[in-house]
A protein has these predicted regions:
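Short loop/turn segments at secondary-structure transitions that flank enzyme active sites
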Residues: 13, 26-29, 124, 153, ...
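Extracellular/periplasmic catalytic domains that process cell-envelope and extracellular macromolecules
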Residues: 12-17, 118-119, 139-142, 168-170, ...
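Helical hinge/lid and interdomain linker segments adjacent to catalytic or ligand-binding clefts
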Residues: 103-190, 369-371
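Ligand-binding face of N-terminal immunoglobulin V-set domains in extracellular IgSF glycoproteins
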Residues: 1-9
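Short secondary-structure boundary/capping segments
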Residues: 36-40, 163-165, 184, 188-200
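Beta-sheet entry/capping signal
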Residues: 6, 19-21, 117, 124-126, ...
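Glycine-rich, aromatic-lined ligand/substrate-binding cores of catalytic
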Residues: 191-386, 390-391
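Aromatic-Pro/Gly-enriched surface loop or interdomain linker
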Residues: 8-140, 396
Length: 398
């Protein structure tokens, strides 16, 4: 008999001393708002490999349709829902809500793992949302030495894409603590940023497909769908690209040879070379899971990038994303599942950008769920703390 009303408190416009900004992915929260997939999805059990655990809010949404739908559901006529708003009760974006797509947490309540850890580590952090980036752009981001994501910033507008790109090129240090990020094009209503539009067609791992001839957004008239369709694969911002998903048990990382190089070794102080990283966690029992991103030079990974670690041991619930399946043939392992497909992995990637900037990508949606293990004394927590502390320092990185 309890409920929570989430809200985000911005810092004062002047006078904040924080060097770190955490960007809350409110676009993605709107996209998943009231999706009720545990009831509405005909493939829920196939995707997760388990019987859905219904929450009280799922049952409420099933009885009272007036709370509206999310962009992962369809109307009665089969048309995909492509408009969402936050100006209503969003019952699945609440602390303690267990989402059908995750072994435990998803979106807001998974991001709270990170907020908890940042406070536990005594980092001074300012909170901003996607809407703030939409309004203020790179001028807001430039106030911070380090800008960080939550665990699943899947939806990004063109304005925000440019803001993050410009921040990186102007010396900003960017931490992508997620997977399947900056994947779908979205647009906010020009007169009301509380309303989001997405159109899913052409390609992509998606819940529905827009009708032919209707791929362009109503809000800005531009082509919707994947950012890859506009020549802006997420590799261009993050160095990694969405490769696989498995809504089941998670796995761990092993260090790669690049992690021993002088440019990278400082991040791994206190972590053994053969030590599994993140073979524990609150989301699927591991740091590498749900959705995974990989290094891919063909899609835009910078040639100067270092692969610090890669995940392994994923089971056959992990499948290849549809946009990477160009030709289906029996025995083609690149269309296969986790146990046979070498592309089923998460790569921790690091590279430097102009003006002493840098990007690090952890490439897993369950990464942040491993921070608190063993009372915060673990190698995921240690690696994150080393990176943030190093990124906050003035002058060139090693």
């Amino acid at each position: 008999n309890e409920d929570y009303i989430p809200f985000f408190v911005r810092p004062p416009k002047e006078g904040s001393k924080a060097k770190i900004a955490l960007i809350i992915p409110t676009n993605s929260y709107m996209a998943y708002a009231n999706d009720n997939l545990s009831v509405n999805s005909v493939v829920a059990q196939l995707l997760t490999g388990r019987v859905p655990l219904l929450q009280p809010s799922d049952l409420l949404l099933n009885d009272y349709r007036g709370y509206g739908l999310g962009t992962y559901t369809v109307y009665r006529d089969g048309w995909g829902v492509n408009i969402s708003s936050r100006l209503r009760p969003i019952l699945n974006m609440r602390p303690k809500y267990i989402h059908i797509l995750s072994p435990s947490l998803w979106q807001l309540n998974a991001d709270l793992h990170f907020v908890d850890w940042l406070h536990e580590m005594n980092f001074d952090v300012d909170i901003h949302t996607d809407e703030d980036i939409q309004k203020e752009g790179v001028e807001l981001l430039k106030k911070y030495k380090v800008v960080m994501t939550g665990h699943h910033p899947e939806y990004i507008t063109e304005e925000a894409w440019h803001a993050f790109h410009d921040y990186q090129m102007q010396g900003g240090r960017f931490m992508y603590n997620a997977a399947n990020g900056y994947y779908w094009i979205c647009a906010l209503h020009p007169d009301n940023h509380n309303i989001l539009e997405v159109r899913k067609g052409d390609n992509g791992t998606r819940a529905w497909t827009i009708n032919p001839g209707e791929y362009c957004n109503a809000f800005d008239g531009k082509h919707g769908g994947l950012w890859r369709v506009r020549g802006r694969d997420m590799c261009k911002l993050l160095g990694v690209s969405f490769t696989s998903f498995g809504l089941t048990y998670s796995s761990y990382y092993k260090r790669s040879p690049d992690s021993e190089l002088s440019e990278c070794a400082w991040m791994f102080e206190g972590i053994g070379l053969d030590e599994p990283i993140g073979d524990f966690g609150l989301i699927g029992d591991g740091a590498a899971g749900l959705e995974l991103d990989r290094y891919d030079l063909e899609k835009g990974t910078p040639h100067r990038a270092f692969v610090l670690a890669h995940s392994e041991g994923h089971n056959d619930m992990f499948v290849t994303v549809s946009e990477d399946s160009t030709f289906h043939a029996r025995g083609n392992i690149l269309n296969g599942t986790g146990e046979t497909n070498p592309n089923t992995r998460a790569d921790i990637l690091y590279y430097k950008t102009p003006n002493d900037g840098a990007v690090i990508s952890f490439s897993s949606m369950t990464w942040l769920g491993s921070l608190s293990h063993n009372k915060y004394d673990n190698n995921v927590s240690r690696l994150m703390k080393n990176v943030i502390t190093g990124f906050m320092k003035d002058g060139p990185l090693p």
